[in-house]
Amino acid sequence: MQRRTTALYFSPTGGTRTYVRAVAAAMPHMGGEVDLTRPEERRKVHMFGADDVVVLGVPVYYGRVPEVPGLLDGLQGEETPAVLLAVYGNRLIDDALAELSDLCAARGFRPLAAGAFVAPHTFSAKVAVGRPNAGDLAAAAELGRRAAEKLSGPVRWRPSILPRPVRPTVRSASAAWPVSGLARRAADGWKAPPLPLQWLIWRRH
């Protein structure tokens, strides 16, 4: 089966988009991308079948998937393999990957692989500047290659190995800041020391 790869991302400052493209480029039959940062794209219905594979990435806000209206509402899979990315500002990803996995599974996607990657922190001009670097992008490409290898043969799906339970979402006034305001806070400055890249694979047995 020749699967078509589609890159999907919400990326106000561009870091998540860079990682998603690096992962997707290492997978076969790249079919295009959907920029969920654009409200008009979030209002559309994007349907994927069992012969597709998606690479979906979001930044981590307050340890969770961003509370953006309709962020994933237009996505619909049908047993569609998904590679999931959470991009964080060199602190912690908290429950973001687990939450993203649950949200995608509820929309018909099958999480196949997942990774957490570092990009400049949205709220600081000094944290994680210069990321992603060459090593980060090489690791992202490796994740894409290994995910593609898993899809080259029969896949036996199993429940997520991400930590549970996911903490309840706490909504606050700060969580409702406009996305454009968040994007404007990204700036250059001191380069944070690198943390070990964290990534994991849903294994095939």
Positions of the model-derived regions?
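Intrinsically disordered, compositionally biased regulatory regions
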Residues: 1-2, 199-204
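FMN-binding flavodoxin-like domain, especially the glycine-rich phosphate-binding loop
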Residues: 2-7, 13-39, 44-164, 193
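Short, flexible coil/turn micro-motifs enriched in small/turn-prone residues
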Residues: 9-10, 172
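Charge-patterned, long linear interaction tracts outside catalytic cores
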Residues: 162-172
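Residues immediately within or flanking Cys/His clusters that coordinate Zn2+
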Residues: 170-180
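Iron-sulfur cluster-binding cysteine motifs and their immediate structural context
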Residues: 178-196, 205
